[in-house]
Amino acid sequence: MPQIGLVSAVNLRVQGNSAYLWSSRSSLGTDSQDGCSQRNSLCFGGSDSMSHRLKIRNPHSITRRLAKDFRPLKVVCIDYPRPELDNTVNYLEAAFLSSSFRSSPRPTKPLEIVIAGAGLGGLSTAKYLADAGHKPILLEARDVLGGKVAAWKDDDGDWYETGLHIFFGAYPNMQNLFGELGINDRLQWKEHSMIFAMPNKPGEFSRFDFPEALPAPLNGILAILKNNEMLTWPEKVKFAIGLLPAMLGGQSYVEAQDGISVKDWMRKQGVPDRVTDEVFIAMSKALNFINPDELSMQCILIALNRFLQEKHGSKMAFLDGNPPERLCMPIVEHIESKGGQVRLNSRIKKIELNEDGSVKCFILNDGSTIEGDAFVFATPVDIFKLLLPEDWKEIPYFQKLEKLVGVPVINVHIWFDRKLKNTSDNLLFSRSPLLSVYADMSVTCKEYYDPNKSMLELVFAPAEEWVSRSDSEIIDATMKELAKLFPDEISADQSKAKILKYHVVKTPRSVYKTVPGCEPCRLLQRSPVEGFYLAGDYTKQKYLASMEGAVLSGKLCAQAIVQDYELLVGRSQRKLAETSVV
């Protein structure tokens, strides 16, 4: 992962002007005769600015020469090969679940399943039901796919997104989904490092580099031990001792930590507060948009468990373009190719019940009704709670939802009039009190690539006190924080880099707020109401409130429906018989 715009072989504190390069890590030094590498190249379709080809005979000699002349690259855009994920236990487990839908007996009467919400949970549910031979009808309230990964195109043709979405190696169901759709090449894998800004040293960063040659957890342990800028050796030792119970206790220990906050758990384990301040404020905000005094320790341990036990678990990839087109549309096309339907602008007004309390139909805003053999709600938990029928509110299963509340988050996009130098081809942890993670999307993402101007996408969190404020106030506050990250290039008054335009996307209720005591409130996908199911990252599954959790929840929801096939067919037949008698 290049830091401050440089490949790791170069002195990271030296900055200067030079050309931008974009290549594949696996193809360096293997250029074809026309100047483009045979596997990946500088030339990307769909952008005039990507049509120029550079012949790079030896990139490593270039970096050595630049270091000597103090004219290093601003950033070397390098996409790394897809890591070897396919033989990991979690990937194979996810692959087996996927294959169970394709190999299940074809239904004599395919079920029509009405699904509310075309986020990743709803799309996943529909995709795997279609694989099992059923006919999903997926309804999306808005005119855009994706839910929490939605994005929009402005009048200039530029995209702005709901969030800054990172695809980890520790996302086995998501990685399987990309493979099943044949779009693995749409993930741009970055160098296996985590880069943290140094608040006390404006403009400087500290790295955790995971060595490729070592297996997990040794690669992660060495990455921590080699970093001497954020933690002292005594702090590392105390932190390691504090983590021992989690490493030895396994999943049962992790689940038992749901009731304690990150900050309280660290103190209980004798871990210095400075470790929490230096590392876990940034990690907590990245995982759930809140600080460690609020976040459940279970959330952190789930992430650490994946990152430390899987060699490529913490390796990160960016999608090569906007999520609705590059990820969601392939899922929709797959669903429709198997006879399913996806309908936009289909907002649900009411869940209409039968006399026995089961679902009769969904009533849409336009007054139309949608009936089916089964019904799924795959919306965010707050939307489902708003539409929860009165007759269901006394059912203990649904009463558990009361504690689950979405956390507010803001995603900020700023287009600058110049290319920023103090950036990197990867995700960056700002360690700012107002900002969480950020990236220069003009570098990390092919569709957003711009050789002349930077576009920073930043997660503004915690956002509870800011979500009701004006966009201009949020931008002003963001610029003050960016002035610390880019002291030579950005000032709050724009006397340096100037803003060309910006977009602020507010999500008042995003993923559920993972405070202590929430785990028992996460519901199984099969509800006690016959024929009604739930999907979404807030439902019961072993991953965080994340894209991976949403995809897995959809698979588990589809699995429950397939398992209930005979029951649902019998229910439909009874309903048909009752209608005939009337």
UniProtKB/Swiss-Prot annotation:
Location of the protein in the cell: Plastid, Chloroplast; Plastid, Chromoplast; Membrane
Chief site of localization: plastid
Regulation: Inhibited by the herbicides metflurazon, difunone, fluridone and diflufenican.
Molecular functions (GO terms): phytoene dehydrogenase activity
Catalytic function, reaction form: 2 a plastoquinone + 15-cis-phytoene = 9,9',15-tri-cis-zeta-carotene + 2 a plastoquinol
Pathway: Carotenoid biosynthesis; lycopene biosynthesis
E.C. number(s) listed in UniProt: 1.3.5.5
Cofactor: FAD
GO terms classed as biological process: carotene biosynthetic process; carotenoid biosynthetic process; response to herbicide
A single cellular component GO annotation: chromoplast
Transit peptide location: 1-110
Membrane topology note: Peripheral membrane protein
Keyword annotations of the record: Carotenoid biosynthesis, Chloroplast, Chromoplast, Herbicide resistance, Membrane, Oxidoreductase, Plastid, Transit peptide
A Pfam family matched in the record: Amino_oxidase
NCBIfam families associated with the record: phytoene_desat
Protein name (database record): 15-cis-phytoene desaturase, chloroplastic/chromoplastic
Organism from which the protein derives: Capsicum annuum (Capsicum pepper)
